């Protein structure tokens, strides 16, 4: 599936941010999330199994599987080789951004201040992850930050909850939010995951 970053961000109001240790859990979790209405799945490269988890999740019809916590071009290449359909980074560097742009993959780098955004704009990027959202000042900070950059849109991630997500999604510059609350740690409770996904999919303001 070939999508641009805008389409990835608009596919659902919440992108589950997934930290999965056991590849055996990957496909069932992906099925529950997609069934609940959250097709865009960000698998963070924070576990040794992450690349295998992505490969397993891609078996699920309708799943749009990407890699998060991508820090450098080597990790980008590994994620692409595993079939990542989009790439999310916690920050913005010229080296990683240029490699991602050259690959053609939808790319969502992290920003936390105006200088980050301006570096992104210099590279032709206008879609960003606002991270860490709550630690960086929350919604008031993003509103102030977004004001000079009307062409930019954001996916706030970090400390956002099911309760606070609607307020973020009501802000025009926010296309979606990243959420780790949808899938808990440990052995998955698939019914609970699908229920949480349904609730998250209904959050679009």
Where are these regions (language model features)?
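Glycine-rich beta-to-alpha transition loops that act as phosphate-gripper elements at the mouths
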Residues: 19-22, 67-73, 89-93, 109-114, ...
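A charged, well-structured terminal subsegment
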Residues: 142-149
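Catalytic cores of alpha/beta
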Residues: 72-82, 115-123, 140, 160-176
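Histidine/lysine/aspartate-rich catalytic loop segments that bind and position anionic ligands
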Residues: 93-127, 131-136
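Glycine-rich phosphate-binding active-site loops on the catalytic face of alpha/beta enzymes
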Residues: 86, 90-96, 129-139, 173-193
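Short secondary-structure capping/turn micro-motifs that flank functional sites
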Residues: 48-50, 73-74, 95-96, 115-117, ...
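Short hydrophobic/aromatic-enriched beta-strand-loop microsegments
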Residues: 63-67, 85-91, 106-110, 127-132, ...
